[in-house]
Amino acid sequence: MVRPTRVRYTVLALTVAAYMITYMDRVMIAAAVPVIQKEFGFSLVTMGWILSAFRWGYALFQIPGGWLGDRIGPRRALSLIVTWWSLFTSATALAWSAVSMMVFRFLFGVGEAGAFPIATRSLSRWMLPAERGFAQGITHAGSRLGAALTPALVVFLMARWGWRAPFFVFGALGLLWVAVWYGYYRDTPEEHRSVNRAERELIHSAMGGPRPRVSAAVPWREIFSSANLWTLCLMYFCYAYCISVYLDWFPKYLHDHRGFDLTRMGLYAGLPLLAGTAGDLLGGWFSDLWLKRSGNLRRARRGVAIGGFLLAAGGILPATFTADPLACVLYTCLAVFGLELTVGVSWAVPLDIASDYAGSVSSVMNMCGNIGGAISPALLAYLVRSYNWEVPFVLSSMLCLVAAALFTRIDAARRISSPGVTA
């Protein structure tokens, strides 16, 4: 008996690498904020708007990005958008004012907008349904691992060549990934020469037959009329707001409020995201294990996500009010671990409810979520200026409780019905 090849796992590994690069490019500016502020004389609020500019571009172009992946296929779509955002990653180093930096960050966000929806679409043709939670967990773990390593790497590069150097280095890394992706990936297993018959049959039997390379038409009416999807979107709004606090401002918080010097900031700022990496891996894996043992998709997705949000809410408050800076970092690790337990599950739900249109459905979710992510950096700056650093974190804890409540209403077993999607 011929054993199936394992090409789908190489596809998954390339997708993990893409997720790592998205977050490395995204969070590198956070580690450079103290140096950029000093050079340009930007206020905290101005820096907040610069950080928000990326997320507005990212949020507003989610749906076009997901649509692009569904229409032309992930191979070409990801190659195009990663090239785009890598160029604007490097362009950030050429900014000469607050406005120019906002424009470059906005255009960078436009490119990154399609990354996760298109990558989700790329996995929908390759990963077995019982592997989806793990696949989403490990890809997002890759993104958080990239983010965790970035502060120390950025500080290292800045110490030798200035704050602009990391933007050029990371931009080049993205272009290298494009060359590998376009050369190896194919939109369906049937198109890949290295996939043997046994692996094709394994994938087809799990999915009920071969799937088309691209979707003929996206059923937008059915998508936008799904109450299940809108609940998912509201939940992800809360999540994205909370995680943005840590992605965009945690290094600055440690430097200004907790008294860490630049070197210690670089070392400690990545620890919560390292804990988040473990959360991503465990959340998706445990949800899939729960599904295999119980056969109950609804409970397998809900249980993990609700537990994660409650853990996050419980970790944020002691991190905020402890007087010990190291205890603050440790409690923050617990909070981000809880937040990231929810991510693989959240991104598995679009695959569960609309696999043929996973790119479009996940883009709607990610757009709504990242409106929260776009509001977060600027609002935090205003809250800190008007009150103190504690208020934004208390707000994040409250939003975690709201997200947990919303997930009690999300049903991963309720598929979006349309002429092209079987209910």
For the regions a language model picked out, list residue spans one by one.
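Helix-breaking motifs and short loop linkers at transmembrane-helix boundaries and internal kinks
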Residues: 41, 73, 88, 94-100, ...
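Cytoplasmic helix-loop-helix junction between adjacent transmembrane helices
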Residues: 104-144
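A membrane-interface helix-boundary motif in multi-pass transporters
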Residues: 159-172, 261, 300-303, 382-398
